[in-house]
Every structure is written in structure tokens, then in C-alpha cells.
């Protein structure tokens, strides 16, 4: 199983939430997009345990199963298609999450998230 981990599920994993731990341990390949890294680090910067959180993230990123995922030109086309679809449906989602969805679809990944607004994208497999 190849997954893209959203920030809320990464946090769940770090807190030992059983489903998050199970899914992440079972995954053959774990993608973490640059947007999620930005969200996490923004949270770290505002918190009291930024150094500890950064160390934990670094250990996670150093796992051979974890790869960082970046946007490219194909991602921008996927983003535009999704933006149009959601606008037409009248169901916009936050910009960061739209980028996350575009990356997951582009790379044929299961999105591991707790955010239910991704349900507005039936073509996006979510766990």
C-alpha cells in the first residue's frame, strides 16, 4: 500500500493513535508532501516543543519507506482540474488540501487523512 500522509494523521501517528500507527506501519511507501511539511513546521514554530517535534519529524523522514513529495507542472494541471470540479460543484476545499489532493491523484496514492471535505472528490481514494 502506497499512502500520502496528511498532517492530522502524522500527528495522530506521533501521539500513538492505534489506526494511524497501524496504517503507517503497514504501508510499503509513505509520501509526505511539501505542503504537509510546511503545515507541521508552522505548528512546531508556534508550539513549546518545536525542537523535540522537529527531531521526531527528522527521524520519520529518514525512514527508507518515507519520501518527500513536491509539486511539478503536472501537479499544477491536476490542481486546476480539481479546482474547476469543486467550484462547479459549489464545494471548495482549503487551498493546501487541494494541493494535497492533486499530488495524491497525480501519483496514484491513497490519501490518509481525517478531513472529510475530501469526500467531495470521489475519484480520490481516502483511508
Locations of regions flagged by a protein language model:
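Conserved beta-strand segments of alpha/beta enzyme cores
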Residues: 29, 65-67, 125
